[in-house]
Every structure is written in C-alpha cells, then in structure tokens.
A protein has these predicted regions:
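Membrane-interfacial terminal anchoring regions of lipid-handling membrane enzymes
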Residues: 1-210
Length: 210
C-alpha cells in the first residue's frame, strides 16, 4: 500500500544520495573501489524481481508475500558486501600468493586496454581454469593493480564460516550452495542478483570447473 510506496521512495532517495557520494569518492580513490550499494533494496524494488515472484506464486500456489519473506534472508546469504578496506586486504593476500611464483605480473598493454574498455561498456564475466589457487587470484590482482572495477567471484557455501567467510564476503565473494535444484526461491534470488550485478557493470570471475 501507501506505506510500501513511501518506503520505496525513501530507499530510492537514499540510494541516489549514496551513489553521488560513491561517484565522488571513486574520482578521488580510483575505480577499483567501485562497490555495489543497496543491493537487497534494489532487488526488492525491481519490477523484474517482483514479476518473477508473482510468476513463481502462480506456479507453486504459494502467496507472493510468503515468497517475499522467504527471499529476504536468502538475499543476506548470497549478496557479497565488498568494502575498500577488505579489497585492500584481499590485494595483499593475492600478492602474497604470487610471492612463491612470480612476484610481478607480465601484462600485455594492448590487451589490458581492451579489457578496460570491455569492462566499462559491457556486462562481463571473466572465466579461468582453476588448477591452483593462484589462478583465482590472478584476475582479482590484475583488476586491482590496474584500477579496474573489482571482480565478484564465486565460492562454495561450505567456505562461508567464521573469519574466512566474512573476509571473502567483504572482498567480493558470492557464496552459493552446492545444490539447490529444488529451491526455487533461492534460484530466483541468485539469478536476479547476478543479473543485477551485470546490469550495473559489476564484472564477475568464475572458474570453468566451478
């Protein structure tokens, strides 16, 4: 009703204010610190997300309000919450992982410029083969050290525990369940979250084996 509409308007106003501050901050600190804000609010007020819930309601026979209540904690479960501090800490970890191999990266300048243009203009997912942990650290180190938008990555929900889970969630990792075939609300939330990130030009990285 009117209360929901007022809440939505307040959310949009606050989001626009935060966006303006975020753009100004990135102009000072760099593109690497571009992080998504108000993701859950953006999903909840998304016409596409609400339409998908209505369609699921018709399919399952469950009320939309019930599906909406189920979706709320699932958003908290899957949505990463990156911050500048943890992006810096993750960059240090990436460099440490490279220490025993090749401390400095060799980068093709022309391809780097091409990648920068792609990330700026298109929804992007960077795919890599996951043979060692350094493979996963390579894309995130590359984008951080060259002031490109941070990469959201994927990890199994079994890794989301205590200090490690919080560290990686705050540096852009999306923890997903290993199996969710019979969990339609979870699938809907995850699908729309990923679509939201890509639409906002937040790139993803994903291992083929994942």
């Amino acid at each position: 009703g009117q209360d929901v509409m007022a809440e939505d308007r307040a959310t949009v106003t606050e989001a626009l204010r935060e966006l303006a501050l975020d753009v100004a901050e990135r102009g000072i600190r760099g593109t690497r610190y571009k992080v998504p804000r108000f993701v859950a609010d953006g999903l909840r007020t998304s016409p596409k997300f609400r339409a998908a819930l209505a369609e699921l309601s018709e399919t399952t026979g469950r009320p939309v309000a019930e599906l909406f209540r189920e979706a709320r904690p699932l958003m908290k479960e899957v949505i990463a919450r990156p911050s500048a501090l943890f992006l810096d800490l993750r960059a240090r970890l990436d460099r440490m992982m490279f220490g025993g191999y090749a401390p400095e990266m060799e980068v093709d300048a022309a391809e780097l410029a091409r990648l920068r243009s792609i990330l700026r203009e298109h929804p992007t997912a960077i795919l890599f083969t996951h043979k060692t942990y350094i493979d996963g650290a390579t894309p995130s180190r590359l984008t951080y050290e060259n002031d490109m938008p941070m990469l959201h990555s994927f990890g199994g929900a079994n890794l989301d525990f205590a200090v490690m889970g919080e560290f990686f969630r705050r540096s852009g990792m999306i923890f997903i369940r290993r199996s969710f075939q019979d969990q339609p609300v979870y699938k809907l939330v995850l699908r729309h979250y990923i679509a939201w990130l890509l639409a906002k030009r937040f790139p993803l990285s994903w291992a083929f084996e994942g």
